[in-house]
UniProtKB/Swiss-Prot annotation:
This is Probable cytosol aminopeptidase. Mn(2+) 1 binds at residues 273, 350, 352. Binds 2 manganese ions per subunit. InterPro entries: Leucine_aapep/pepB, Macro_dom-like, Peptidase_M17_C, Peptidase_M17_leu_NH2_pept, Peptidase_M17_N.
Amino acid sequence: MNFHVTSGTPEKQRTAALVVGIYEDEKLSSYAQRIDKASEGYVSRLIKQGDFTGKKGQALLLFALPGVKAERVLLMGCGQKDKVTAKNLRQSWSGAVKALQACGATEAMICPLEAKPKDEELTQWARLIVETAEQALYRYEHTKSKKESLKKPLAKLTLLLDQRSQQPLAEQGIQQGQAIAKGVNLARDLGNLPGNICTPTYLADEARRLAKEYKSLKAKILEQAEMEKLGLGALLAVSRGSRQPPKLITLEYKGAPGKQKPIVLVGKGLTFDAGGISIKPGERMDEMKYDMCGGAGVLGTMQACAELELPLNVIAVVPSSENLPDGAANKPGDVLTSLSGQTIEVLNTDAEGRLILCDALTYSKRYRPDVVIDVATLTGACVIALGAHASGLLSNDQSLAEHLLAAGQTSDDRAWQLPLWDDYQQQLDSNFADMANIGGRGAGTITAACFLARFTEEFRWAHLDIAGTAWLSGKEKGATGRPVPLLTQYLIQRAQEAKTS
């Protein structure tokens, strides 16, 4: 979709559809008031008659409104004025986009709720509009023989502002929104692909494709033989039950001088997880194709970073394999030697994500990182604790944790911090190795992070458990693209700090 910015009065705009917000309790947004005045109270009469209440997500399409040059006016319900949040506005705008798509409008114009928002609010609003529009129009069709037929796709959206001086701020928001939307859609596509297509080799090829598309990106893939020489024993043990060769995928972005320490993003790329010898129940096992959403999210973030040309150095590391049962697969009771030299007793082969991540975290040390952030669909315990709304966050550096929490709030891709206390480490004690790969039923998300913490003592590190936020089940089943918005916002914040320092 193409996005543009213009300024002027709403009633004088020639467009296929003009979108204005309406609050509950018969309250009109500032732009809706202008439309109401131009139409001699048409909108307010509709509301008083009960034809439109302004409830969140409600949409009403009006044709040939008197005194208004737009072909259609779409009233967008925004809920109670004093309770409008970014999440509520996303829901309202998503419903409006679907209404525009249904009516066959190929282009439309949308107004802010208020004529004179603060600078930061205007940029965030423009970004939200773009991200939500792209998300609402997303369709997965890669493995369908028949494509979904649409009347005419919504191809152009113009953001209408009160003053021309506001346009640069909105254009900045559009640029950020388009970059994030591209990254989110890439992560969703990769997550939604079935495991027989999106293999470790496919993920590696996707990294190579990104490197060809963006000159600022450089891809490097470690094959099994190279990993054996280096001693990535934990990652290789997980992959032994699969016929698909494992990969260690790196994608480097250089947007700053070489002396600037890189930010390293590590993403779990387990393209299918049957649990190995500790095999999972059959119910919903198909959703284990989503176990690579950490890796997909990291690749999507790298694309967004390249789109924005951020003045940072960022490196993605994606350990990728399958976890399947086979005569060669690792077994409960096996002891593995990781790249760090530490030994691990495997008590449950279905706790494999931490095994491929620990070698990737150790591998990240060679880049002398400023910070390392790993992203993984790691524990069912996180789904129980936080559900589908917040990702779990644990860190050995409180400043880093606070920056990520702030990025989550700004991007509406929120996280919730859990403790990483030494008290939990004893749950990983083993009589036969330096540690066990699980710590019992209690505090499963925390003990998984405690396991990873043993491989991150030499750098600042944060862990995002996205097991509850990476995909949806049920009627709306599919990958969400999270945490691309959170990670990209964190990188935007770091880039802004770099400019001012």
